[in-house]
Amino acid sequence: GGGAMEQHANCVDIEWDKVQPGDLLFYPEDEHVGIAAGRDWLGRLLVVHCAAGTNGVVISHRTGFETAARPVWYGEE
């Protein structure tokens, strides 16, 4: 529970050039969250997320995502 805002609260923001698979990507005001999946053959970031109107999970580019963040795991400071 808690949604994207709570997930973002448990992350540290990172620069876009530091994004690795598994990092979280957020829309403005944490309205939506996606997971970095890697990069396409042109080096563009790929994002896995649920998209309205698509009936499920999609892989897309980072359009609309404003902030990149890395989850802070238990035991890390």
Please name every model-derived segment:
Residues 1-62:
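...with weaker cross-activation on analogous glycine-rich loops/strands in unrelated enzymes
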Residues 65-77:
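Low-complexity, Gly/Ser/Thr/Pro-rich intrinsically disordered linker/tail segments
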